[in-house]
Amino acid sequence: MGELAATGSKGVEMIAAMLVPADKGKNATFEYALNGVVAYVTDPAHEALRDDVRKGLLAAIDRCGDDANRAFLFSQLQFCSTAADAAAMARYLDDPYLADYALRALVSTPGTEALLLAEAGKDDLTAARKQALAYAFAEKRLAAAEPFLLTWLEGADAQTAEQIYNALAACGSQASVKPLAAAAAKTGCAW
C-alpha cells in the first residue's frame, strides 16, 4: 500500500479512472486498491501522504462520469477529507444522486462548520438543501445554526419541517422549546 499511496494524486486518479459502470465490468480490484490506499494514509504514521490522496479523490470525483463510482469515491473521501475540501464537497449537495454522499462527507469532516453556516445564510436555498443542512447541523450539534433553523420553519413543507425539528432538538436552545412544543402538540404528544 505504501507504494500505491506514494504515487499521490496522480496514482489515485489513475486507479479511479479504471473504474467502470457496474453493468460493464467488475470494480472490486480497483475499489480494494483505493480503499487500501485511503486506510493507509489515514494511519497517523503515513499522514504525510494524505493530502495528495485527498486531492486525487476530489479530482477523480470531478472527472468520473458514473454516479455509482462517484459515490464510492465520496465514501473514501469522507475518511481522509479536511475542512479545505468542504467547498468542493458542497458543490454536490443539490445533486440528486450524490447529495447524501457529499453530506455524509461534510458531516464527518472536522472543521466544516463555517462552510455549513455560510451555506445556510444563502437566500436561494431549496427545500432539499435546507433538509440537508438541517441534518448536518443536527449531526454536528451546531448551536450556531439555530437562528437559521427557526427562520426556515416558516412556510416549510412537512418533510423539511421534520428535519428542522430534529435539528432543533439536537442543537437548539431555549428559543427552540416553543416551536418544538407546538410541533409536538400537533402530533398529539404531551410534554
Predicted regions and their residues:
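Structural signature of alpha-helical solenoid repeat scaffolds
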Residues: 2-5, 20, 34-42, 78, ...
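Amphipathic alpha-helical scaffolding segments comprising HEAT/armadillo-like alpha-solenoid repeats
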Residues: 9-21, 43-62, 71, 80-94, ...
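Second-shell loop/turn segments in exported
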Residues: 1-2, 74, 103
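Alpha-solenoid helical repeat scaffolds
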Residues: 104, 131, 135, 162-166
